[in-house]
Amino acid sequence: MNFEGKLVGTDLKVAIVVSRFNDFITNRLLDGAKDTLVRHGVEDSNIDVAYVPGAFEIPLVSKKLAQKGEYDAVITLGCVIRGATSHYDYVCNEVAKGVSKANDVSDIPVIFGVLTTESIEQAVERAGTKAGNKGAEAAVSAIEMANLLKQF
């Protein structure tokens, strides 16, 4: 038997957790995610957005939203750009671990859509220019995974 999640968002309710830090990038990711959800049939009224100060705060809020029982998926969006210190490594590792843990404590998908880039140029490329929009890609993953998990 094969199981696959369809890319149909009708009747799905989705939460998006987005970081305000580097908002010139995260706003583009958010726009891409919301546009993709709506294009796949998710009603705009079924998309809730929670803003957090930075990427480090994403895991806690995504876990709380996932545990509420109101959503079919949670999408996380943020942008961490390497600087001159090791802060980048700590933030990236903890955000990835935290989002993974949020998946472990809920029955819905928590999708990792946080950019971890070496430069501002890489971030811009992944927020809607030549490398696509990773927010849109995260939305597609959320729809597919939400529909897949409904089969179990």
From Swiss-Prot:
GO cellular component, one term: riboflavin synthase complex
A GO MF label: 6,7-dimethyl-8-ribityllumazine synthase activity
The keyword Transferase appears for this protein: yes
Catalytic reaction equation(s): (2S)-2-hydroxy-3-oxobutyl phosphate + 5-amino-6-(D-ribitylamino)uracil = 6,7-dimethyl-8-(1-D-ribityl)lumazine + phosphate + 2 H2O + H(+)
Assigned keywords, A-Z: Riboflavin biosynthesis, Transferase
Disulphide-bonded residues: none
E.C. numbers: 2.5.1.78
Subunit structure: Forms an icosahedral capsid composed of 60 subunits, arranged as a dodecamer of pentamers.
Name under which the protein is recorded: 6,7-dimethyl-8-ribityllumazine synthase
Organism the protein comes from: Staphylococcus haemolyticus (strain JCSC1435)
Gene: ribH
